[in-house]
Design a protein with these regions (language model features):
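Short amphipathic alpha-helical segments
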Residues: 17-19, 98-102, 144, 216, ...
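Short alpha-helical
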Residues: 12-13, 94-95, 209
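A solvent-exposed beta-alpha-beta segment
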Residues: 1-84
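Extended, small-residue-rich solenoid/repeat segments and analogous flexible loops
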Residues: 74-143, 147-148, 153
């Protein structure tokens, strides 16, 4: 029975997730849903930029052989298509949070995906709807909140706490006893030393080295990371 939907349509995210699923799960995929406006793309022009045509785009309301639905009021579609389980891979943590609230009301199961190469060092707690890409390391007694996306090559050391609906981009390294708040975005190749606290809704720019705590709703960048501005 094809009773699984995926929220999110980008080849850089959803495409990778579908590619990582085993055959059994792929056969159960029903459709793609997005709460975001789907941009109009000149596919021929895009393929000229990359002649091997490896990037996939929505064509005739389909991608990866699955129908695509763009709608903020998605509950009706889920019911009509008899969807019982979903992966949620929309762009931002706030969007994922809003979708989670609706899905919980409808009692639709929110699925997690943890790649087989991920190393879990024990006594870990992992929330609902978490997606962890290949070659990540989750240290002893570290916890991950709901709706977190952890991209490839992240190393989260022991006794860390990652809040709900965070986006952790590739090759993040944290020291022990680090705490990252809810709705944070940590960009590519960031290093965070031991016992750092990063507040809710904060962002850290690419390649930064975090040596000091970061308050709520702040953007920090650099080596060492310094305050840039309040995060909108």
């Amino acid at each position: 029975m094809k009773d699984i939907a995926i929220f999110g349509f980008k080849d850089s995210s959803t495409g990778q997730l579908i590619n990582m699923l085993d055959d059994k799960l792929r056969r159960k995929l029903n459709c793609i849903i997005s709460i975001n406006k789907i941009p109009k793309i000149n596919i021929a022009e895009e393929h000229k930029k990359r002649p091997n045509k490896k990037n996939e785009f929505i064509l005739n309301n389909k991608i990866y052989g699955l129908p695509v639905f763009q709608e903020k009021n998605f509950v009706k579609t889920l019911k009509e298509r008899k969807i019982k389980k979903v992966f949620v891979f929309e762009d931002s943590g706030q969007q994922r949070s809003n979708i989670f609230k609706q899905l919980k009301k409808e009692k639709i199961k929110i699925l997690s995906f943890i790649h087989s190469s991920v190393k879990l060092m024990g006594h870990n707690t992992i929330g609902k709807g978490v997606i962890i890409f290949p070659d990540c390391y989750l240290g002893y007694k570290s916890d991950i909140g709901d709706g977190v996306v952890i991209q490839s090559g992240c190393r989260i050391e022991h006794h860390n706490v990652i809040g709900n609906f965070c986006d952790l981009n590739p090759n993040l390294t944290t020291g022990g006893f680090t705490k990252i708040g809810n709705y944070c975005e940590i960009n590519i190749s960031v290093d965070i030393i031991n016992r750092i606290r990063i507040g809710n809704f904060s962002r850290v720019g690419t390649g930064s080295l975090v040596l000091k705590n970061i308050k709520d709703k702040e953007l920090h960048y650099g080596r060492p990371a310094k305050f840039v501005r309040k995060n909108k």
